[in-house]
């Protein structure tokens, strides 16, 4: 089933995969293909109707050269697909590790990233109402 899901990406044969314990809401797997290392996400929670917005936003940020885990489109152009009856995304595996204790340099880097994020989305035709607006309160 996994090999059939991965074939349309045209990234080569499956070499290895393993689950990632650090996921918070979704099931995530490291996937090694002939073309490199990736993360496969099976979306377990959240509103499925929000997924196209998230995919489009991450694509926009990737196009702006921000280091984000964007959804890779398959050969048919579809980035949001289905595996085992769940929405699924294949993303590049980003380098790095989780920071356990942030310092001033980390905060500077986050500030710079947020500035670049705002610039990248300032003219984006993307819109999604907040889930935590006044009606939520």
Predicted regions located by residue number:
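Extreme N-terminal tail/first-helix region
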Residues: 1-8
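Short N-terminal amphipathic alpha-helix/helix-capping patch enriched in small hydrophobics
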Residues: 2, 24-27, 54
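ATP-binding glycine-rich phosphate-binding loop
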Residues: 9-32
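Residue-level "edge-of-site" marker
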Residues: 19, 74, 130
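ATP-binding pocket architecture of kinase catalytic cores
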Residues: 33-126
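Active-site catalytic-loop/activation-segment of kinase and kinase-like phosphoryl-transfer enzymes
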Residues: 130-137
